[in-house]
Amino acid sequence: MPKESEVINSEFHVDVQDPERLNGHPVAKFINKLSGQPESYVNRTNYIFGRTLGAGSFGVVRQARKLSTNEDVAIKILLKKALQGNNVQLQMLYEELSILQKLSHPNIVSFKDWFESKDKFYIVTQLATGGELFDRILSRGKFTEVDAVEIIVQILGAVEYMHSKNVVHRDLKPENVLYVDKSENSPLVIADFGIAKQLKGEEDLIYKAAGSLGYVAPEVLTQDGHGKPCDIWSIGVITYTLLCGYSPFIAESVEGFMEECTASRYPVTFHMPYWDNISIDVKRFILKALRLNPADRPTATELLDDPWITSKRVETSNILPDVKKGFSLRKKLRDAIEIVKLNNRIKRLRNMYSLGDDGDNDIEENSLNESLLDGVTHSLDDLRLQSQKKGGELTEEQMKLKSALTKDAFVQIVKAATKNKHKVLAGEEEDDSKKTLHDDRESKSED
């Protein structure tokens, strides 16, 4: 039986003879050999680890500095103990590594390196420091359809390239679209290929559901088979949200989402007054991408030739005020709950990690900003009081704000904000009884 490292090396063509990878300090290599560490573990000495950027069910993502190049990178650290006996998740890890190494595009996060210890796998990728897509939009003084076109063109270009390689991302959403740096003209990159799939051929289909509710295509949920068109649907949802600040779908369950998609002639509605100053071309663009039958959706290449993309008649009026109404509350709620969930996941991982043999400390907690939680609590109190005044029902405006959240984030932050604040700050375990379709890797089912 080959070792896990041998399986990865042969499967993903990692060149273990690369001098930069293995010609490390001879003392470090000798110590690693004595301690039973894999040969590639010597590469860890080339990195200084920084803050934790995120955490899932099987590990964390941390910022790091590569000493040999002085380059900042992101390192996904996965616990082998958490993956042990889970062949599906191991296969997903191998597929993510394989896909990342095959892709090379300016709008796709780039693969840098991988290595392993006795207890963990390390995947090193480009670090995008410019912030998430919607966060940057909120910081602007002006946002027009022209700006939206520039964003969607970059996303479409990346998806067109992926699809040419028969790769389906399956989790396109604003949180996975990042700016490379903080410069005004920074390019965007698509990140998180954790549930991406390599198709065997042009017409190959996947039959197991995975994705994020609110952005996932209907055919993924019905498990009738999905392929490249599911990414096009997600682009349609991103475009809609980009131009008005709220999600087109407010359902908090799979059943509710499917009902929303099929209740009317079109799966989405362009509400007044939010869409009054938006061009007819972009509405047509969105409706094309959101066709219920995946076979009827245009390809990424065809969308790049759409009149909204190529026309010089795109609206230039400032739509930022309306967009901010939807983005602002969404950001406050999501930021607070993600910090709470991050620390809780890290605690669970640390408990598992403490049983390992590695001497390094790769998993650390982040601090929760108390003022952030205060602001969210007040926003929720206002929302709750206004709802009570209207007989327990949210207004249309409040429903739009709520629709900007995923089911899990909204449910969990309401719970957190209504509990004793100090318990929340202490990282009390959250109730995971209700989950979205895509909660990191726990609910990702694969072939």
From Swiss-Prot:
Phosphotyrosine modifications at:
Y353
Q: Where does ATP bind?
A: L53, G54, A55, G56, S57, F58, G59, V60, V61, K76
Active-site residues per Swiss-Prot or TrEMBL entry: D171 (proton acceptor)
Q: What class of enzyme is it?
A: transferase
Specify whether Repeat is a keyword of the entry. Answer: no
| CDD domains attached to this UniProt entry | STKc_CAMK (cd05117)
Q: Which GO terms describe its molecular function?
A: ATP binding; calcium/calmodulin-dependent protein kinase activity; calmodulin binding; protein kinase activity; protein serine kinase activity
Domain Protein kinase, first and last residues per copy: 47-309
The UniProt record lists the EC number as 2.7.11.17
According to the record, the residues making up region (Calmodulin-binding) are 323-334
Q: Write out the coiled-coil annotation as residue ranges.
A: none
Region (Disordered) residue spans: 421-447
Task: List residues modified as Phosphothreonine.
Answer: T316
Q: Give the matching Pfam families.
A: Pkinase
Ranges of biased composition (kind: Basic and acidic residues) = 432-447
According to UniProt, the reaction catalysed is:
L-seryl-[protein] + ATP = O-phospho-L-seryl-[protein] + ADP + H(+); L-threonyl-[protein] + ATP = O-phospho-L-threonyl-[protein] + ADP + H(+)
Q: Which InterPro entries match?
A: Kinase-like_dom_sf, Prot_kinase_dom, Protein_kinase_ATP_BS, Ser/Thr_kinase_AS
Quote additional remarks. Present with 7500 molecules/cell in log phase SD medium.
Q: What does this protein do?
A: Important in cellular regulation.
The text of the family note is:
Belongs to the protein kinase superfamily. CAMK Ser/Thr protein kinase family. CaMK subfamily.
- Binding partners and assembly: Multimeric.
Its name, as the record gives it, is Calcium/calmodulin-dependent protein kinase II
Source organism per UniProt:
Saccharomyces cerevisiae (strain ATCC 204508 / S288c) (Baker's yeast)
Task: Name the gene that codes for it.
Answer: CMK2
